[in-house]
């Protein structure tokens, strides 16, 4: 067995789901009970000398997962270098680490992505475990302790708690069979989830006992499983010339500028506090897509794909805001994002996820949703979002130069979503994801909420519901005293406190998501290549956060409109509106004759006390309700 098989499986499972360059070290230590377990493992697998004599190791395996078959190859070199490449159906993934830097390719575009922040730390830790540094005489600088005993249907185990020498990383749990002394299971925390690898088919090969089969799965996501079966091993092969460092001869990415090389300016519709683009697939008519920095991959709605005969393959579980949902995959020959003047960009052979997103989102947005433009497209550019002008400008990172007056803020990249450091109420600090797919000011993640007991600090708390890729989720909304990001700050921000136990809102790596209710205050520039964010205050900068003044949300279903949600104690609730009721007219005008944007302004704009009428169908007859606007928070 080579531990890199475990790493490739976990990386593929998480990469398709979707701290600095020199972390400080901790002192090496091993407890006496743990030493007994490690010594027995070494004896069972061929001895300590056999392990340390493997200066380099090559492993090749057949892999199966997500509905695809593929191949995996890995090279590792003591003490801290690693390179692997995986093909799985239409996807290819490569990754490497030279001990100080690390990189991987985007599995959908093959773009080489240098790793930073927690991603770099995770890569270095994974290499440390692959090389079984914890079994060396000095534990490779790590910390090893006996956690206890466990039992399942297959046997009894001694469980070690193994911490790498890098601070800020949760330890892994290694399960050793009490009968054989062999390592049978590895549980690796990954943010709010765990990646579990089961090892089996142990055989003697090249002087050591090795597990020839591994099954890796993501806890609570049963569809995300990958099996690797080793078919070739070599010890001490030459690793000369392997790309442990990021390769510079990256493959062409299949993108072209449609009008002017290096820059494209696109019309961007800002509606319902979301960003909308026109996108054409394979030369077809323009369709409505969301532009979403919180999406790890570009997504096509499954209903749209079925109606247009787009073939799909594979399967996986993907995490949304408060839950998880299923996805398949498709390859699109050409995707063009362009305006009426022909300006824009086009991508060839783009691999996309296919998910059932339209039913949830279309009702909220009063328009059909064909898909979502995500990280795999967005990260190729320096993106400038001008909320006031309604434009999205895409720049080539190689030629872009910022010409404004604001100082750059350092972008934090953990995974595929950019983040900034921020502070709430002058004391609660964390990294916040910049999510232009959110209409909120700030959505605070469950672990951050619990750590700082923010539920008791909210003013005017209200229960609210929202929607993400995985479906609906519940939160609590209210105001805190202040929010600061770099030199920018606001009083009385509206925040949502998540109680999600799965999905993105259960993340421990981020304090929360910053959404468009805050970002619309700026002209926003995201420079992924150089890890910089520019915030240029605009006309909304000093506006106070205002919640809906009706306390209701109307859902559009093509041929009818329902009351999607009604907040308790809101003006809509006081007028008698009930969730789920059919709404047929507003101020006497048939509801389906209203444009969604015009209706939004009509229902929310104006001073407190302004009123309008809703006609609802109740008990088989129309009933007119009068709603008076009033600020709720």
Task: Please place each PLM-identified region on the residue numbering.
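Short, hydrophobic/aromatic-rich segments at coil-to-beta transitions
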Residues: 52-60, 78-84, 153-161, 181-185, ...
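Flexible, processing/modification-adjacent segments and terminal tails
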Residues: 29-37, 43, 101-172, 178-182, ...
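Short, surface-exposed coil-to-beta transition loops
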Residues: 68-72, 89-92, 167-172, 194-198, ...
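Bacterial N-terminal signal peptides
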Residues: 11-24
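N-terminal mature ectodomain segment of secretory-pathway/periplasmic proteins
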Residues: 29-30, 36-110, 145-148
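Beta-turn initiation residues at beta-strand->coil junctions
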Residues: 63, 86-89, 106-108, 162-165, ...
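A short, surface-exposed beta-strand/turn
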Residues: 74-85, 95-98, 170-185, 229-242
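Pepsin/retropepsin-fold aspartyl endopeptidases
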Residues: 175-178, 200-633
